[in-house]
């Protein structure tokens, strides 16, 4: 509960970020070190949204079924899709954040909030996963889907 309280309090939706300490906009070309940091912040932002989704769903968190927390979390998912994690977007930084870290946390949040995520939004979120993790990249890896 305390972590979610802090995340919700600190959340400031702005171009290129959901939290001031987690700016994820693409860095200047050639700045490979900063690209890795910023791609990690995409994953970090989705992990924070997942934490908020857990708190919304779990009993006794102090945030269980809190409509304002739900609204904030859904706005965060929409912002991430509009700003950075969307089909057709070019990647930067570390492949792990685009192919594993971010989509795993985002999909966890969507499962937790499934009945509240509009179908059109969910379709866009999953299209982004399909874009960054195309079948051709995982078809030769048994047990991976």
Predicted feature locations:
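Aromatic-lined, polymer-binding surfaces characteristic
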Residues: 4, 8-145
């Amino acid at each position: 509960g305390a972590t979610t309280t802090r995340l919700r309090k600190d959340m400031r939706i702005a171009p290129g970020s959901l939290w001031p300490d987690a700016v994820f906009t693409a860095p200047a070309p050639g700045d490979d070190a900063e690209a890795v940091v910023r791609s990690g912040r995409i994953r970090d932002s989705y992990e924070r949204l997942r934490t908020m989704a857990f708190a919304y769903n779990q009993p006794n968190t102090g945030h269980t079924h809190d409509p304002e927390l739900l609204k904030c979390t859904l706005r965060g998912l929409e912002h991430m899709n509009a700003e950075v994690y969307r089909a057709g977007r070019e990647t930067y930084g570390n492949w792990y954040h685009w192919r594993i870290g971010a989509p795993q946390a985002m999909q966890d949040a969507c499962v937790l909030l499934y009945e509240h995520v509009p179908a059109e939004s969910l379709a866009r979120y999953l299209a982004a996963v399909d874009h960054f993790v195309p079948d051709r990249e995982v078809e030769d890896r048994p047990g991976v889907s």
